[in-house]
Amino acid sequence: MRNITKILTLILATCVLAACEKEEHVNGGTVNVKGAYVLNEGNMGPNNASISVLDIDSAKIDNEWFKNANNNRMLGDQAQDMVQYGSRLYVTVTESNTLEAIDTATGHSTQVSMGSLKPRSIATHGGKLYISCYNPPCVVRVDTTTLTIEDTCFLGSYRPEGIAIAQGKAFIASSYLASNIYSYDDKVYVVGLDSFKVAATVTVVCNPTPVVQLDNNTIAVGCIGNYGNIAANTVLINATTLGTTTVGIGSTKMAVYNGKLYSYSAPYGGTPSYAIISADGSVSDFPFQPSIGGNPYAIGVNPSNGDIYLANDGNYRVPGDLYCFRPDGTQRFKEEAGRLPSKIIFITD
C-alpha cells in the first residue's frame, strides 16, 4: 500500500504542476489521463465517506488517500459532491455540514464549516464556488481564495439538488419538500450570476435531481419522477432561450463525453438501463450492456480514450466496486472502492 500511495502521490504532483485555474469544463480535445479521484459518499451516520485515488496504468487504487493525508481523519458523514477547480478538489459533506478544500498534490484538506446549511452540489465559475444547500433552500457563492460565503440566493420551499452553469446563469434543480419527502417539485431555478437573484424558473418533470452542463448552451436535467405514475425523464434546457426538450428516458446519473451524455437510469426496484443522449435530444444505444454485480451508483468516461467507468453501490452494506470497460465492452479491470462510490473525476495533465 505504501508503494501504491507513493506512485499515486507522484502522479498527482505531476498533474498539479501542469494545472491552471480554469472552469469546470465540458471535455473535448486531446488530454492525457493518468488517474482518477473517486468520491465515496458513505452511509448516513457512520462517518465513513472517503476519497479514493486510482492509478489507471497499474489499475491500483488507494482507498485511504484522504485519511492518510489528514492524520487519519475521515471525510465525514455523507459526502455529496466533488469538483476539481485549479489545484484543489472541493467536496461537500452534507450531514457533517462541511466543505473540504483539498490540495491535490498532497491530499491535505482545509475543512470549512457550513453552519447548518447542509451543502449539496457544486458548480464553479470565475474563481467562485456555487453550492446548493438544503437548510434553508438556497445557493451560496463561496470565494475560493478566502473560503468564505460571499452571498446567498434563497430558492423557495423545495430542497435544491444539482447545479450547473452556462451563459452566465446557474441552473439549480428544485427537488422535494423537507417536511414531506414525497412532495416533489418540477422546476429548475435560473439564477443570474451577476445579480445573484432568481431570474426565471423552467418547468421540467417531477423531482429534478442531477444537473450537468452538456455543452456551452445546453443544460441536462435528470428528473427522477415520483416512483409511481410519473416516470423518470431527462430534460435538456437551452441556456440562452430557456426552451426545453424532453428526451423520454430517465437519467439517474450522467457523464459528458465528446458532446454527448452517457447516462443510466436506476429506479428503485427496477432494472438499470443505459443510453447515450445527444444535445438535440436524440437517443442512441449504449455500446454494450454493462455487468457490474449490482446497481450502478457512479459513471464516468475517460476523456482520453472513451473507456467507461461504472461503480456499484455494494448493496449499501459493503464497499462498492469500480469497473473499467473499453468502449467495446471488454472489462479492463475491477477494483474495490469505498462505501457508495458516487462520483469519478479524471486526473489530467
Model features per residue range: what roles?
Residues V16-A19:
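C-terminal motif of bacterial Sec signal peptides marking the signal peptidase cleavage site
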